[in-house]
Amino acid sequence: MCHFNELSIEIESKNLRSAKKIFHCPYEECGKKYSRPSLLEQHLRTHSNERPFVCDYTGCSKAFYRKSHLKIHKRCHTNVKPFSCHYDGCDAQFYTQQHLERHIEVHRKPKPYACTWEGCDECFSKHQQLRSHISACHTHLLPYPCTYQDCELRFATKQKLQNHVNRAHEKIISYSCPHESCVGHEGFEKWSQLQNHIREAHVPSCSICGRQFKTAAHLRHHVVLHQTTLEERKTYHCPMEGCKKSFTRSSALKKHISVIHEGNMAFHCDSCGTKFGYKHMLQRHLERGTCKKAHKPYINECGIKHDGIEGVAIHDQKEKELSSNLVSDVAKKIINEVTGHGYKEAREYSCSFPECNYRFKRLYDMHRHLNSHH
């Protein structure tokens, strides 16, 4: 009865783990499913060939699906091998646990082929390994020559010869472009070459509005904007009592709490000392020229205060220009507002959504429009 209960518990535990895997891979013929969105996102990179984790060592541009894989790779640059073989007389060390386990299997295999040279106790599981050992360690013969013209190198094993040929004489196409519409490229030797090609020739773009993005991940986040309303995307609610604010990103919620509820003002004007919670508010303050410096102001003939003597001179010049052009400027402004003339020229940033004609002078204003209206 005890064994039956243990078996029932184990089966039930497996069923619970399986039931929690509610995030399915959307690709056809792929039945993978995961318990967390982050795991599904990692898996999707194997379909899209997206490797966002790139080695930053000079001269190395290898990229990986996961951050943990990049961490392991960097050990080859620092030569850190934390996994050591525990067999007596074996000092082998490895970068990963998997490589160590693969090496240990070599120790466990039967080794019927023993070296007969005097003083040598080496044994091998394959006869070819024994022959290579004798050539490399005892006779120092290199029986495998390179057959390419003008190449006189020789090697102790077939594998070393093949590695040399692949590296020095033959272009091995290891990576092909996954885009079906890509023509004119046979393939690439290195993963980094393929990634550079994809970034330049296949820029991720939205099929709905045409907007382009640096990575496929940014595009996936953008597509959600078309599929859901703004209120549906605001899933991060402020927990403070009496505050009904909600946000589309956790970072925006954290910033809101820090500024509005905790009063953290990280940005300040160097001239007047005014503090702001957001960088764009400081930028707006500087652009509008409303900054009041702490030093004693200069007063011109009109009785208007200025931050410096230069301000007085500029003001006087503007007064002269204004007196001569006031009527024409006012008339032009009224005409522009009525006719819409000059609206497009003054606003270089346009909304990328179809049937939306809003335009903006600043990129920041356009982003605020996208978040609040689309």
UniProtKB/Swiss-Prot annotation:
MF term (GO), any: 5S rRNA binding
Q: Where in the cell is it found?
A: Nucleus
* Zinc finger map (C2H2-type): 23-47, 53-77, 83-107, 113-138, 144-169, 204-226, 236-261, 267-291, 349-374
Extract the InterPro entries matched here.
Answer: Zinc_finger_trans_reg (IPR051061), Znf_C2H2_sf (IPR036236), Znf_C2H2_type (IPR013087)
Q: Specify the domain of life of the species encoding this protein.
A: Eukaryota
In terms of Pfam families, this protein maps to: zf-C2H2 (PF00096)
Q: Which GO terms describe its biological process?
A: transcription initiation at RNA polymerase III promoter
Q: What is this protein called?
A: Transcription factor IIIA
